[in-house]
Amino acid sequence: MAQVSSEHSDRSPEFWRQKADEYAQKGDFVNQAVALGNLSLALQEQGEWEQAQESSTQGIQILQQLSTTKERDQILAQSLDIQGKLSFSVGDFSAALVSWQEAGKLYQQLGLTEAEDRNRLNQVQAMQELGLFQSACEAIGARIDENVSFCAGVKLENLPENLRRFAGDRLMVLHLQALGDTLRLMGDLESSQQVLELGLELVDGDTETFDKLQLSLGNTWRAKGDRQWAIAQSATSTIQFNFEFCPILENQEEYDSALKHYQNVSENNPLLKLQANLNQLNLQVALNQNILDFNPLEEAQNLNLFNTQSGNNLILNTLQTATCISTIPWQNIAQNLQTIIDVSQQRKDLKTQSYALGYLGRLYEQHAQDSKEYLQTAKTNTQKALSIAQSLDLNAPELAYQWQWQLGRILEKTQSPYSEILSAYKAAFNTLQSLRQELVSSNRDLQFSFRDEVEPVYRKYVDLLLQNNPSQDNLKEARNVIEALQLAELDDFFNDACITAQESKLEDIASDTAVLYPILLDGKIAVIYTLSDSLIDYTIEPLSNPQRFERTINALINDLKEDINNNYQQYGQTVYDSLFSDKLKSFLSSHDQIKTLVFVLDGQLRNLPMATLYDGEKYLIEKYALAVAPGLNLLAPGSLNSLDLRILPGGLAQKAPSFDLVHARLNPLSNALSELESIAQLFENQTPVVLDESFTVEVIKSYFANVYYSIFHWVTHGQFSSNPEETFILTWNERLGVNQLNELIQSQAEFSSEPIELLVLSACETAEGDNRAALGLAGVSIRAGSRSTVATLWKVDDRATSEFMSQFYQEMIENKKTKAEALKTVQESFLSGEKGEALRDPRFWAAFVLIGHWI
């Protein structure tokens, strides 16, 4: 039986046209369709996309009009495969997936397992391009082993031994490669590595598959390095305010592994070797290392990569890298971008066209200092790229946001009207809001560095909104942008857009409460403040030396943590003066009904207890009850009902096996039992204290079957970090990460849908040297579903903690105070000397912070 096959594509299009005509004249319609399919393949090889589409469509239509037979169905499946390949090559991934899915059904009906497996690999490619990672993972995972949950987001401890039956089976090893790639795109990097390494063990002499796996492993190690670098940047670097054309990475050991795998790709397959070389080049340039001695553009031209969408992607990535190599003339890069624009227009590949135009605009923006005319060229190309990205035929918001931001930068550099610049940034912000899921994707096409490519848009937009005597509408928009930034940071922290935000209503906030939004901008600090009646205003204070301000915050935190210096009042006053301008102080004094200040904090300020800000005479806690909110839109609704409170007290008083699971030396919390028992006595129908050997996930869960607990008070070691993998608390035998803690507390949702009222973690601390460690505290609070969380930012003497927490509950339960008022009362009693002269020092009372609802 004749077949449609790429093996025949070395014949000229004219040969297949002649064959198609001959078969048509004979009335042999099946073979006519075969010839038309092969004609389409031959035309694709020459880049004749429209003619290839016509031939493919004609062949399929002929087959669809014939009666169903085994031969007809097999040829139809092959023809649909070719049509899918064509659609994929021109960047129409949705059409490609539809064609391949139709072909796959036919192969399954015909029992052609090998053809079905090849087809499945094609489908997965299309799903990956469309961002349908879960569907791709499930499709490929079910074929490999339907009894293994590859796609559940749970780390694979050990791969099943029976997968070794695929040794030497090229197609199934390629399935493992596709699964590893998909797991990487889903962000499950450890499982991706495991699956790909198993595939490498099972290759058995197939050099092409070996090379594909090496390339995939290199990409997974690169993704692991990028993640570690992002975490390190988050912890130690200052805020990035401006766009970086060529950001430099810091070396991670994962990058060394990536380079090794790229170098392991053999010369046998020129295209795979080029991909590996390009990925290696990209990484070495980003690491500021010596680069490969080869001309990637010349090799790309030799391999005819300008004719396909995937080839264009390779070239575009190369050109992006080339812009950061000083020895490559940027005009050469511009010429190559123009070539891609031309061929993608011929191919009607809108996505590639938008990318190339946008990159061309960015290239001219990058070199704008050479000529004023370059900025106009940059603007024109950026606008074209944006228009295509927003067209109904493409609708690619992940591109549109980049070009909207780029347009805003260019408009600012050309000193365009304020309204035009603001409009561009507003558009970029709105597009970002629609892109929450994509922003946490690990897809290299969609992957954004939060610090470099997302956060600066929010901060610049707020900066613009606060210029030119802002209206109430602009002030409210600025407040909303800050709220959105808080949410985006948490999405980035979890690598998952899983948090549900709800629009807060300021009128629901009591009139005695003011909400303050400090935000660090380029060279200044702004504070937006608002009352329940929707009155909103702002102050801006210049920071002549932002680095010095950050050092002051760090010095204050270190002084509070360590019993070395006593400069915390001096540092506290410096920070107070930066946040509380004369205008803000005047506002607060003229609204003497304000009793509570709620801070939505930014950057390093999150690590600092606001109670320690000092006005020269008093600490802020002496004037106001204080709380920190991760954002008003993230607060759980409702109010405290002390009549219905049930507490589950637990913790560790002895040295536990889990202490060995962390690097730091931990001491037993010898006063844990007295703290827990004194608190438990304040509640009726009290559950016994869950202590030491009983403080395990299994025992805690066993209590949920009979009672709904609204308060969890746990005295145990733990750490908050900007790295979710380093954010944890300890049970007797486990180190619970933020997601495991969430699963534990939320497991009682089987018995009640009510939110948890209060989570107290009274022996935790923030990670040393981590500027955004308190982000982990906010993450714990939100993931646990708690309306409020009380925790310590550093370790406090456990005797002082026991006394502090006992009084806190007395004030809240017996004296009916809000959580913020109760915390204020206890902190003032320590400060006044009521608890003893030794405990007046802020080191003993300032570590306790209230996150979330203050009522």
Please place each PLM-identified region on the residue numbering:
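Alpha-helical solenoid repeat scaffolds used for protein-protein interaction
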Residues: 117, 125-128, 133-165, 169-573, ...
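Catalytic-core domains of enzymes
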Residues: 499, 508-509, 603-711, 726-730
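Solvent-exposed loop/turn segments at secondary-structure junctions
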Residues: 41, 85, 522, 603-607, ...
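Short beta-strand scaffold segments in enzyme catalytic cores
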Residues: 525-529, 679, 848-849
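Catalytic cores of nucleophile-dependent amide-cleaving enzymes
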Residues: 630-633, 710-803, 807
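N-terminal leader/linker segments that initiate helical-solenoid repeat arrays
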Residues: 1-38
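Non-membrane alpha-helical segments in proteins
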Residues: 31-45, 75-89, 121-125, 177-181
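An often Trp-containing, charged/polar helix-loop segment at the C-terminal end
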Residues: 592, 801-855
